[in-house]
Amino acid sequence: MRKLASIILFLAILSNSFGQSKNSPLQISHLTGDFYVYKTFHDYKGNLISANALYLVTDKGVVLFDAPWDQTQFQPLLDSIKARHDKEVIMCFATHSHDDRAGGLNFYRKKGIKTYTIKATDQILKEKNEKRAEFVISNDTTFTVGQHTFQVYYPGKGHAPDNIVVWFDKEKVLYGGCFIKSAEAKDLGYLGDADVKEWEKSIKIVQSKFENPQYIITGHDDWKDITSLKHTLHLVQKYNAGKISTKK
């Protein structure tokens, strides 16, 4: 009887993980190989906005790149990963200090998950009296976790003064977070902490350093069109030329 109850519980978790609809608060999509994109949602000024993030399954455990924007999904994400892959999350990187990226640092740190930011992000969180990561890393750091290697890199200011990208050279996956706008974006979105003039320089650095990406994951909206980095550069150039306005 106890074994049957365990099976029923496991199937319930699986159903919650895989039975996703477009209305699910947590949506997980397979990208390629051991890479998965997950999407959560947040009510921003009366509009429900999606946020994309990434996780990587390794032999040692799962690595998260950014936390859910919806704090009610912090634990369901861990549960879904456990049900789908039978692995624990062991590391979490925040790609800048905004809530849609760093909001889960404290939750995951309390779970015993190693959390990481660069120094600039740590300083911003400290100044705002917000919870910080356990580990502070340099602006260009390469990690090997299990069978995978990835590079965490700060290209310069852009959407935020501390935005980083993550590059997986073997698979040619570029995780851009909010540094890269969706190819369907009409403007640059929130610019409260942005440096749009420097953003153009930073994009060109990324284009030069990480050539021929096969997958590019944007911070919001549709991420499947890999012209997103070029499109972001186009939006930035239009903004700097005074030909485009944006939200504040």
Summary of predicted features, one role per range:
Residues 4-13:
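Sec-dependent N-terminal signal peptides
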Residues 59-61, 72-116:
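Active-site metal-binding motif and surrounding structural segment of the metallo-beta-lactamase
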Residues 34, 56, 66, 81, ...:
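Divalent metal-coordination and catalytic microenvironments
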Residues 14-25, 197-248:
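Accessory terminal helices/loops
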Residues 30-77, 165-178:
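Conserved beta-strand hairpin/beta-sheet module of binuclear metal-dependent hydrolase folds
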Residues 37-39, 55, 63-65, 90-94, ...:
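Structural recognition of the beta-strand scaffold that forms the well-ordered cores
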Residues 22-31, 61-62, 69-70, 116-227, ...:
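Metallo-beta-lactamase
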